[in-house]
A protein has these predicted regions:
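A short, conserved structural fragment
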Residues: 53-65
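Long, compositionally biased intrinsically disordered regions
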Residues: 34, 66, 94-95
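Short, hydrophobic-biased segments on the C-terminal half of alpha helices
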Residues: 11, 45-53
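Short helix-coil junctions and helix-kink-helix linkers
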Residues: 28-43
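Minor-groove-contacting beta-hairpin "wing" of winged helix-turn-helix DNA-binding domains
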Residues: 65-74
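Short alpha-helical segments that sit at the start of domains
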Residues: 1-22
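Short, amphipathic alpha-helical interaction segments positioned at domain boundaries
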Residues: 75-95
Length: 95
């Protein structure tokens, strides 16, 4: 998987699981359970997810403080637009 495929998969799975608003997850949980990425991709996936949090054009934001590194989608619309703009697959019912 290339980097953009990993980013798209993370956003798609977070959207499908509706991790938005008050619903948040830890970075480790998103990578290992929500996105269900292969173990050999987990390290790079965590790096990409962390980069996306600090990138204003990405639909993912950090939430809360402390050591837990919680993330959530900025909005459903932002996630759908991101996937469309980056040749990602939008989950059924969100398009």
């Amino acid at each position: 998987m290339d980097d953009q495929e990993i980013r798209n998969r993370i956003v798609r799975k977070m959207l499908k699981n509706q991790i938005v608003g008050n619903h948040k997850k830890q970075i480790d949980t998103v990578v290992s359970k929500i996105a269900a990425l292969p173990t050999h991709e987990e390290g790079r996936s965590k790096e990409l997810l962390t980069e996306m949090v600090s990138n204003a054009s990405a639909p993912i934001e950090g939430y809360g403080g402390g050591h837990r590194q919680n993330v959530r989608l900025t909005s459903v619309e932002d996630a759908v637009d991101y996937l469309k703009d980056n040749d990602g697959e939008v989950p059924f019912g969100f398009d």
